[in-house]
Amino acid sequence: MRLFHFLKFLTINNFSRYCLKIVKVHIIWITIICIIYFNWRFKKLDFMAIPYPPAVIKFNTSAKYLSSNLASSSQLGNNIFEIASLYGLSKHLNRTPLFFIENGYHKKMLDNLRKTMPRLMEKFRILNGSVPRSISETKFQRACCLHKSPWSLEKNRDEYLHLSGKYYQSWKYFPNMRNELIEFLNPTSIQIFGNLPISDDQNHVTCVHSRRGDFVEYLFYASDPKFMKNAVTFLNENEKVGSRNRKIVLFGDDLNFLETYFSDAVLSTDVGKNAEYYISQNPPIDDFLYSKNNCDVVLITAPRSTFGWWIGYFSKGNKVYYLDIKYTGDHIFESGGLIASDFYPSHWTPLKFASANSFTVVRS
């Protein structure tokens, strides 16, 4: 009898456990469905931004480290600025740079940077997880595009120095490091640029970068076809190339825009076709490598474009022209968030329209 009751108890208990598991499974699926629905309906939940658990770190080591908040959801040009600046700051402060993989965007950023500048990322210690609460945050870098002296950081003796800023878009954070950063570009990438011309004794290559896309959406100054065309005329008149053929290579995020205003241009995929104007359809890393090897002169037509900035910085000729941001009505510049001498290297040349009633381009 006792055995019977015991077996009955086990049967009921097992059934209860089974029912509980069924309920839990249904709750989990209902929760997942609700999350997906609300994400689709209200577009507010971003799975990529969900924080990872805190990284495991050790204290009382013999090293000192430097890390920062990162605009990891931004595009490649912004990402390179942040990493190059942190590397430059870490060298100045004699610290080891850290990269915390805080969420899905950080993971994507890391993957893209490893493809583009693997040797630079080898300089960083990579930690899988968010910044632990045991690391305090140090205020630094209040705006995107200006330089703040690191002298205040020199006094900090914390083992882990974590900065509050983002973007770090100033060449002054990595001065005199151009050759080193160029060498960090991925050397294993197959340097086949399609139909794009090669800079040599026969050809002089001018590289023109444009940016439309989200610049139009967010009311940043996007590339203006009138400025692009007239600035190219300015360069043709002022850049002496001797007997070499002039070749113009266009880079940009809006193929329709480029084909509309440069209808005679051929694509980099149009193998065998010869022309004066070409449009690159290559991946970003190939565009950087092409610039390193072939861009004698660079024209940046969207002055806030960080990708265009790096095309100029990595360029073979290290001779860069850009639309003077003072004449674009850029709200970041006008609010003091961008200082031109911090953002643009001093040997780069600003251009502008000659007057409000003229499309002739002149030096600013």
Curated annotation (Swiss-Prot):
<keyword id="KW-0812">Transmembrane</keyword>
<keyword id="KW-0328">Glycosyltransferase</keyword>
<feature type="glycosylation site" description="N-linked (GlcNAc...) asparagine">
    <location>
        <position position="60"/>
    </location>
</feature>
<keyword id="KW-0325">Glycoprotein</keyword>
<dbReference type="InterPro" id="IPR052501">
    <property type="entry name" value="Alpha-1-2_FucT"/>
</dbReference>
<dbReference type="GO" id="GO:0005975">
    <property type="term" value="P:carbohydrate metabolic process"/>
</dbReference>
<keyword id="KW-0808">Transferase</keyword>
<feature type="transmembrane region" description="Helical; Signal-anchor for type II membrane protein">
    <location>
        <begin position="20"/>
        <end position="42"/>
    </location>
</feature>
<comment type="similarity">
    <text>Belongs to the glycosyltransferase 11 family.</text>
</comment>
<keyword id="KW-0735">Signal-anchor</keyword>
<protein>
    <recommendedName>
        <fullName>Putative galactoside 2-alpha-L-fucosyltransferase svh-11</fullName>
        <ecNumber>2.4.1.-</ecNumber>
    </recommendedName>
</protein>
<feature type="topological domain" description="Cytoplasmic">
    <location>
        <begin position="1"/>
        <end position="19"/>
    </location>
</feature>
<dbReference type="GO" id="GO:0032580">
    <property type="term" value="C:Golgi cisterna membrane"/>
</dbReference>
<comment type="function">
    <text>Mediates the transfer of fucose to the terminal galactose on glycan chains of cell surface glycoproteins and glycolipids. Required for axon regeneration after injury.</text>
</comment>
<feature type="glycosylation site" description="N-linked (GlcNAc...) asparagine">
    <location>
        <position position="128"/>
    </location>
</feature>
<dbReference type="InterPro" id="IPR002516">
    <property type="entry name" value="Glyco_trans_11"/>
</dbReference>
<feature type="topological domain" description="Lumenal">
    <location>
        <begin position="43"/>
        <end position="364"/>
    </location>
</feature>
<keyword id="KW-1133">Transmembrane helix</keyword>
<dbReference type="Pfam" id="PF01531">
    <property type="entry name" value="Glyco_transf_11"/>
</dbReference>
<dbReference type="GO" id="GO:0008107">
    <property type="term" value="F:galactoside 2-alpha-L-fucosyltransferase activity"/>
</dbReference>
<dbReference type="GO" id="GO:0048680">
    <property type="term" value="P:positive regulation of axon regeneration"/>
</dbReference>
<keyword id="KW-0472">Membrane</keyword>
<dbReference type="GO" id="GO:0043413">
    <property type="term" value="P:macromolecule glycosylation"/>
</dbReference>
<keyword id="KW-0333">Golgi apparatus</keyword>
